[in-house]
């Protein structure tokens, strides 16, 4: 499950962009380095997933900026909390203008923006896109410690683990399941979604196929595998699009009589945060449901 990207590029390019940023830094009085504080006073996130962790783990006064994506309720778990927070498209000049003590980025954040911020002396924490629950714990811990709230990160991890440890009694034989997302994308072995499926008591049939961690799965193959549970995206806002039309295919509607449909809103497991537990609950309920 690739981490969501904000589609950002750095403002300005080459030496000209660097000179403009340096001038802006001089004007703001940020070019001189200062001793690191125990907790950065102003933190700007330029990644959807670190937006959520910053808002959930940081003090409100620390949240100096997030991405514009976090203000959209369709794809953000913290849209309400993000309203009123300065939002950027991740351009380096926008970020510098918010006077950050720390910037949170991610694997899919514009490398040009990250490089330019570092060139002018802005500290950047580059979070990863975890593919395992251990990786999720590590990234929560990394961000929490970076913003000076390691204790809150540990509390978030403990609550996530508590919810992921709920007793589950899947029916036997274990239900065979497949994830089908827009454009036919699915989740195979080595993905975070695969680990959640298996933990919930489901057999991921994609593991029986030669499919990348995240790859495309033909609809006909889904039907031919004899699945018991089909996991699709929950309702998406906006008009119908070609990417989602396959989820309305007549063949899938016919499966309704013998296949349980589990709808998981994409934002629940797009990022590595506490809402993963909500996605897990949907999967576990499907695993326990009678035929």
Question: In which residue ranges do the predicted regions lie?
Answer:
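Bacterial N-terminal signal peptides
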Residues: 20-33
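A cross-taxon signal for low-complexity, glycine/charged-rich
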Residues: 3-14, 20
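Short secondary-structure boundary segments
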Residues: 47, 67, 107, 182, ...
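A short, structured surface patch at a secondary-structure boundary
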Residues: 41-108, 112-113, 202-205, 252
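Sec/Tat signal peptide C-region and signal peptidase I cleavage site
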Residues: 34-38
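Short helices/loops that flank or line small-molecule/ion binding pockets
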Residues: 92-100, 120, 216-226
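His/Asp/Glu-enriched short active-site or ligand-binding loop at hydrolase and phosphoryl-transfer sites
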Residues: 192-214, 234, 261-263
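Extracytoplasmic substrate-binding proteins
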Residues: 39-42, 102, 112-185, 206-208, ...
């Amino acid at each position: 499950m690739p981490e969501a990207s904000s589609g950002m590029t750095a403002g300005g390019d080459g030496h000209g962009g660097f000179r403009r940023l340096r001038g802006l830094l001089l004007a703001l009085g940020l070019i001189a380095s200062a001793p690191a504080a125990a907790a950065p006073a102003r933190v700007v996130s330029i990644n959807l997933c670190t937006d959520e962790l910053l808002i959930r783990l940081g003090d409100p006064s620390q949240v100096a900026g997030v991405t514009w994506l976090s203000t959209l309720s369709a794809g953000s778990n913290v849209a309400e909390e993000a309203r009123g927070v300065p939002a950027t498209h991740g351009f380096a000049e926008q970020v510098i203008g918010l006077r950050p003590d720390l910037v949170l980025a991610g694997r899919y954040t514009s490398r040009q923006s990250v490089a330019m911020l570092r060139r002018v002396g802005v500290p950047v924490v580059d979070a990863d896109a975890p593919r395992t629950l251990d990786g999720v714990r590590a990234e929560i811990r990394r961000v929490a410690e970076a913003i000076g709230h390691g204790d809150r990160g540990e509390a978030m991890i403990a609550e996530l683990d508590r919810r992921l440890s709920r007793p589950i009694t899947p029916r036997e034989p274990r239900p065979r399941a497949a994830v089908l997302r827009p454009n036919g994308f699915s989740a195979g072995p080595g993905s975070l979604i695969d680990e959640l499926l298996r933990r919930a008591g489901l057999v991921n049939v994609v593991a029986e196929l030669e499919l990348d961690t995240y790859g495309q799965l033909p609809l006909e193959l889904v039907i031919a595998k004899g699945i018991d549970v089909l996991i699709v995206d929950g309702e998406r806002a906006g008009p119908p699009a070609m990417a989602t039309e396959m989820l309305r295919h007549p063949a899938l509607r016919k499966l309704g009589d013998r296949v349980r449909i589990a709808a998981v809103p994409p934002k629940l497991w797009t990022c590595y945060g506490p809402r993963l537990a909500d996605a897990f609950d949907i999967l576990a309920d499907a695993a326990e449901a009678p035929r």
